[in-house]
Structures are given as C-alpha cells and as structure tokens.
Amino acid sequence: MADDATRKAVSEIPLLKTNSGPRDKELWVQRLREEYLAPIKYVENNKAADNDWFRLESNKEGTRWFGKCWYIHDLLKYEFDIEFDIPVTYPTTAPEVAIPELDGKTAKMYRGGKICLTDHFKPLWARNVPKFGLAHLMALGLGPWLAVEIPDLISKGLITHREQQGS
C-alpha cells in the first residue's frame, strides 16, 4: 500500500458493507448512507491530524460528486475543483476523479482531466470490493496522485499559485 501514515489514516476509515450500485435503487440508499459516513469520518480524522485537504458533496441521487481538493506546497495552498460520476457498475468499478483545470498538463491524466489511477489504485480497489468507498478513493487514489503530480507541475511551471499569477 503506502507509508505508515497512509496506512494509519486508511485503517481509520470505516469499511463499507453494502454491495450495491446506483442501478439497485433500494440497496443503493443503504450504500449511499455508508458512502456519506465514511468521508465524514475521514475528514474529521484529517482535521484532527491537521491534514485537511478536500471537501465533497453529491447530487440528490448520489451519482454525481463534486468538490474541492487542495495541496500545500512551499507554504502556498493550491486549490482545485474535482468531480466524478459513480459508474453504473459501482462498486465493482471505481469512479474516475477529474480535475478539469489540470487537463493536458500531465501525462498521468486522461482526456477531460481524469487522473490516472490504473497502475496503483485500481488493483487495490478491485481486491477490496465492496469494502472500499469514496473515502478510500480519496485517501488511496487522489491523495497520493496530488502528492506526486502537483509538486512536479509546479516545478515545471505548468501551474502557479494564484498570488503569483498577477505578477
């Protein structure tokens, strides 16, 4: 998996029990309850550890998610909009997180700003269906991607901090 801090953070995220996707209307409501509770717990834990880095919300059906994530680099906060849809084959298929404003700036991204998680995250997700949910997607997918890609994009001058854009 990853370093000890990540293992600890992930071990504190509640595992999900309901194996259901959006096509199964009755069980999806139960799964959605679990999906809401796990990120809430993860964000609470992150805040307690002074490591708060994202917010998520969804449409009423829980099939479209959006929010913000941020990354601190050299004491500057870089903030990005994120979005993803729940696949109809969820939870067997992991959602694909998109950061539209970074589209085309890194090779580790697909068209539309979808971040590449195929090599490291998707096999881990597949081994943990249906226990993993959106909080795990953030902790083991988006978080590590940001930690690798954002400093690289900054060093290449492909993204700049908002305060530096005006000068």
Curated annotation (Swiss-Prot):
List the protein's name: Ubiquitin-fold modifier-conjugating enzyme 1
Taxonomy, top ranks, is: Eukaryota, Metazoa, Chordata, Craniata, Vertebrata
Functional description taken from the UniProt entry: E2-like enzyme which specifically catalyzes the second step in ufmylation. Accepts the ubiquitin-like modifier UFM1 from the E1 enzyme UBA5 and forms an intermediate with UFM1 via a thioester linkage. Ufmylation is involved in various processes, such as ribosome recycling, response to DNA damage, interferon response or reticulophagy (also called ER-phagy).
> What's the family?
Belongs to the ubiquitin-conjugating enzyme family. UFC1 subfamily.
Q: Which keywords does this Swiss-Prot/TrEMBL entry list?
A: Ubl conjugation pathway
- Recorded GO CC terms: cytoplasm
Q: Which GO terms describe its molecular function?
A: UFM1 conjugating enzyme activity
InterPro entries recorded = UBQ-conjugating_enzyme/RWD, Ufc1
Self-association state and partner proteins as the record states: Interacts with UBA5 (via C-terminus). Interacts with UFL1. Interacts with UFM1.
Tell me the GO BP annotations in alphabetical order: protein K69-linked ufmylation; protein ufmylation; response to endoplasmic reticulum stress; reticulophagy
Annotated active site: C116 (glycyl thioester intermediate)
Q: Which domain of life is it from?
A: Eukaryota
Cross-referenced SUPFAM superfamilies: UBC-like
CDD domains per record: UBCc_UFC1
Q: Does the keyword Repeat apply?
A: no
